[in-house]
Amino acid sequence: MRLDLVWVIYRAGSHSAHREACCCVDELQALGVKVVMAMSGVTANPFPDLLASEAGLPDLAVVLGGDGTVLGAARHLAVHDVPILSFNVGGHLGFLTHERCLLDGGQLWQRLLQDNFALERRMMLQAAVDSRSPAERTARPTASLQDLNGTKALHWALNDFYMRPYRDDVSPTCTLELEIDGEVVDHYRGDGLILATPTGSTGYSMASGGPILHPGIDAIIVSPICPMSLSSRPVIVPPASRLVIGLLGENTRRVKLWKDGASGALLEPGQCCVVQRARHHALMVVLEQSPSYYRTLTHKLHWAGSLLNNQPSPS
């Protein structure tokens, strides 16, 4: 891997992440690498300015934080095919990150320069708000997301999109219609709907009763949030599916589209949200020689396997 330009992105508000970021900058600059350091958080999004800079795209983005910091980087960098190397510094579960200890030892950058790593491609989703009339939708049911969005940027997600009722004063339910490849599947009344990737299957979707999917599988998980019908269950659909979610009921109700937990768009009555697999993948640098997704699950979720694997062998 070439390392002419590297972005070092650290979690805002984390002293440990900032300290590690400074160490990375010093080590890379000692190797003659040009480095740009920036913080990322709920109120700090460095990527629009970084992408607009004259320096151009980096060869690598080093992300120091938790999964949320990685998700923010992936939403902006996947479309540019920028690889992401992430470490869990100041984060929580860290399904997407390497352990912090792999930052130590001074051999990390040489490994990258010698191509001693793997590149994992993670499926992403993209979405657009459809503001057309019912007649226009009927005439062009498969209009591209770019056509629907016009000059607005598409919404991207590595984990999930979800739609929930939007009100400032109360917490109402909503009724959402799900259409898959032109066929109405169900009406979900409850707190909303989650559309997740296999990567996002261990996040909000799992907390809502959805299944866990191996990231080597390309599929889309549809998980209702607290549905008011016992027959409303999560479903898994093929990755090439086109999903359209519309708001039913009172014409004063609005729903909010969220992307990986970040604000996306507000859907007014009559509008729909169209979601499908993104053309680009998130490129994740993997350092482990023999990575095991199941070992990660047992460790992060404290399954019995993590206890059994740590037991001493019988003599």
UniProtKB/Swiss-Prot annotation:
Residues given in the record as NAD(+) binding sites: D67, G68, N159, D160, R189, D191
Enzyme Commission designation: 2.7.1.23
Gene3D superfamilies: Probable inorganic polyphosphate/atp-NAD kinase, domain 1 (3.40.50.10330), Probable inorganic polyphosphate/atp-NAD kinase, domain 2 (2.60.200.30)
UniProt-annotated location(s): Cytoplasm
Keywords from the named record: ATP-binding, Cytoplasm, Kinase, NAD, NADP, Nucleotide-binding, Transferase
Pfam families registered for this protein in UniProt: NAD_kinase (PF01513), NAD_kinase_C (PF20143)
InterPro entries named among the record's database cross-references: ATP-NAD_kinase_N, ATP-NAD_kinase_PpnK-typ_C, NAD/diacylglycerol_kinase_sf, NADK
A single GO BP: NAD metabolic process
SUPFAM superfamilies per the UniProt record, alphabetical: NAD kinase/diacylglycerol kinase-like
Active site positions, chain numbering: D67 (proton acceptor)
GO cellular component: cytoplasm
Reactions the enzyme catalyzes: NAD(+) + ATP = ADP + NADP(+) + H(+)
Molecular function (Gene Ontology), one example: NAD binding
UniProt cofactor(s): a divalent metal cation
Entry function: Involved in the regulation of the intracellular balance of NAD and NADP, and is a key enzyme in the biosynthesis of NADP. Catalyzes specifically the phosphorylation on 2'-hydroxyl of the adenosine moiety of NAD to yield NADP.
Xref: NCBIfam families: PRK02645.1
Family, similarity comment: Belongs to the NAD kinase family.
Protein name listed in UniProt: NAD kinase 1
Organism from which the protein derives: Prochlorococcus marinus (strain MIT 9313)
